[in-house]
A protein has these predicted regions:
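C-terminal partner/receptor-binding element of secreted or periplasmic proteins
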Residues: 41, 97, 103-128
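Extracytoplasmic/periplasmic, Sec-exported soluble proteins
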Residues: 27-38, 105-109
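Sec-dependent bacterial lipoprotein signal peptides
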Residues: 1-19
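Short, intrinsically disordered, charge-biased short linear motifs at domain edges
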Residues: 4-6, 29-34, 112-115
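Mid-chain, structured segments of secreted extracytoplasmic proteins
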Residues: 69-104
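Bacterial Sec signal peptide processing site at the extreme N-terminus
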Residues: 13-34
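Post-signal-peptide N-terminal segment of Sec-exported extracytoplasmic proteins
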Residues: 33-74
Length: 128
């Protein structure tokens, strides 16, 4: 009588062991280029193609291929001969470390830029 109960209990334990969740796969750290490509696509879509009035006076230049390993996007004044960037968003390393700097980051728009860039770098493509 005990042997059948022990066998049933062992079978049950074996089945429970088979049901345990598998550990999540390790997430590969994103390279600077991967992150900046994602940020560039979302910035283009959300800031410029959407006609967002906050970015109407700017245009974006992307410099994703870089020998320095620091891909970046630049915002410059639209229609101006002055090509100095007003905003630089760049990443470096794996995992990517982001920076945003320039005169625009001293304006009220800086909070939105920071929030958008962080959201896009983390994988979302939502505009805001």
């Amino acid at each position: 009588m005990r042997k059948p109960l022990i066998m049933i209990a062992l079978t049950g334990l074996a089945m429970l062991g088979a049901c345990k969740p598998t550990p999540p796969a390790a997430v590969k750290p994103q390279s600077a280029l991967d992150v900046m490509e994602r940020v560039m696509v979302s910035a283009s879509s959300c800031w410029f193609k959407s006609g967002d009035p906050a970015f109407k006076s700017y245009r974006m230049d992307a410099e994703l291929t870089s020998y320095s390993g620091q891909p970046r996007i630049l915002l410059v004044r639209k229609g101006s001969g002055d090509i100095r960037p007003l905003l630089v968003v760049m990443a470096q390393g794996t995992p990517a470390r982001l920076q945003a700097f320039g005169p625009v980051m001293n304006e009220p728009l800086s909070g939105r830029i920071s929030a958008d860039v962080k959201r896009w770098a983390n994988g979302s493509s939502a505009c805001h």
